[in-house]
């Protein structure tokens, strides 16, 4: 906040055009040695910024691209990086800076591919047939695990100029991360839970843009950021209303914040957390915190699903069904049901299970169960933060 002449302070509004450059105060692994994943707990110092947030909000992160990938692209283009180009905001800059900070340089757009096949006879022969609408699925399968750098290396006859190349790129967008802390306990910092994306495909190491950017921010390093407020994904106004939280993996982030908020307020309204990951020994994020919350009553019930700790895989939706009668009872008591995490599979599985619980334990028909779940959502008692 800025100081006014009368001693009061005014709130500073941060957004994409006016971000706050926050520094990392802590970057530590949540996953233990032996885990197949790299998930980080990252704390960001916002002291002196006037930045305010509430539980359920997200933090917008303006990432930069991987410098090694930028150098590989420059090499493939035969450029030194000092060439003059126009960035995504229509401002003059160097090619290297544009690739590092302004443009998305991983996933090729259809526009990029359409121009590529016009410039390269080899690409026209190999990729051209996939660019018709009838081949949409085949194109998606072909592009899986491939990035722009692959097309630059494989089709050098395209002979891109720096200006022509960047003209086909999309703007590098902000990434949103669910905030994993409560301002009531941490007013000067924001916590994130970040799953670092790294994998090999087609002979190259691929890296998630924002997750790798954050994971490689050592303590003291800063980046552009601002808070993206939530509209509905927040705690009930009445602290006595029960809450059911389904947050496997990094989806647990906002629920850590919810529970911290209730801890700070001394609230003992019922709360139930479903958490899942691969292995309890290596991948139980915030285990000590949640165990302590169980002891002091902030967390009423904790149901876990570790998919690889037994021969058959168990996920959070399986635990929901096992506890279906009690879960239904909580819903009848007015509980708010939250889900956070993967939208493509997990959230759909959880939704199907919620319908099944309404049928099996609520005695509802399929149509009545669908109406019940729809009403939960309409009444803001079924809230999602999925991505």
Please provide the spans of the model-predicted regions.
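FNR-like FAD-binding dehydrogenase module
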Residues: 1-387
């Amino acid at each position: 906040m800025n100081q006014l002449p009368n001693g009061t302070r005014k709130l500073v509004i941060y957004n994409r055009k006016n971000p706050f450059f926050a520094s990392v105060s802590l970057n530590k692994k949540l996953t233990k040695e032996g885990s197949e994943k790299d998930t980080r707990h990252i704390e960001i110092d916002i002291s002196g910024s006037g930045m305010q947030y509430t539980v359920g909000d997200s933090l917008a992160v303006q990432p930069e691209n991987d410098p090694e990938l930028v150098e590989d692209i420059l090499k493939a283009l035969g450029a030194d990086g000092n060439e003059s180009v126009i960035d995504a905001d229509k401002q003059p800059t160097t090619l290297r800076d544009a690739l590092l900070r302004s443009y998305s340089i991983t996933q090729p757009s259809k526009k990029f591919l359409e121009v590529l096949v016009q410039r390269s006879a080899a690409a026209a022969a190999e990729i051209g047939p996939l660019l018709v609408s009838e081949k949409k699925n085949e194109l998606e399968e072909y592009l899986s695990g491939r990035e722009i750098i692959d097309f630059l290396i494989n089709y050098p006859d395209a002979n891109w100029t720096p200006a022509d190349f960047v003209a086909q790129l999309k703007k590098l967008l902000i990434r949103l991360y669910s905030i994993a802390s409560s301002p009531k306990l941490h007013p000067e910092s924001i916590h994130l839970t970040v799953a670092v994306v790294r994998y090999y495909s087609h002979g190259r190491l691929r890296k998630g843009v924002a997750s790798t950017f954050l994971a490689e921010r050592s303590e003291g390093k800063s980046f552009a950021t601002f808070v993206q407020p939530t509209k509905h994904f927040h705690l009930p106004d009445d602290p006595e209303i029960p809450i059911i939280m389904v947050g496997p993996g990094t989806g647990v982030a906002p629920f850590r914040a919810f529970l911290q908020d209730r801890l700070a307020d001394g609230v003992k309204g019922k709360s139930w957390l479903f958490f899942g990951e691969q292995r309890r020994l290596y991948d139980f994020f915030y285990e000590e915190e949640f165990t302590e919350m169980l002891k002091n009553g902030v967390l009423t019930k904790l149901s876990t699903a570790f998919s690889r700790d037994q021969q058959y895989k168990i996920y959070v939706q399986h635990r929901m069904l096992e506890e279906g009668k009690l879960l239904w009872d909580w819903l009848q008591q007015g509980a708010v049901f939250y889900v956070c995490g993967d939208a493509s599979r997990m959230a759909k599985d959880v939704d199907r299970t919620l319908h099944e619980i309404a049928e099996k334990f609520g005695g509802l028909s399929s149509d009545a169960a669908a109406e019940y779940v729809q009403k939960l959502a309409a009444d803001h008692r079924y809230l999602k933060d999925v991505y």
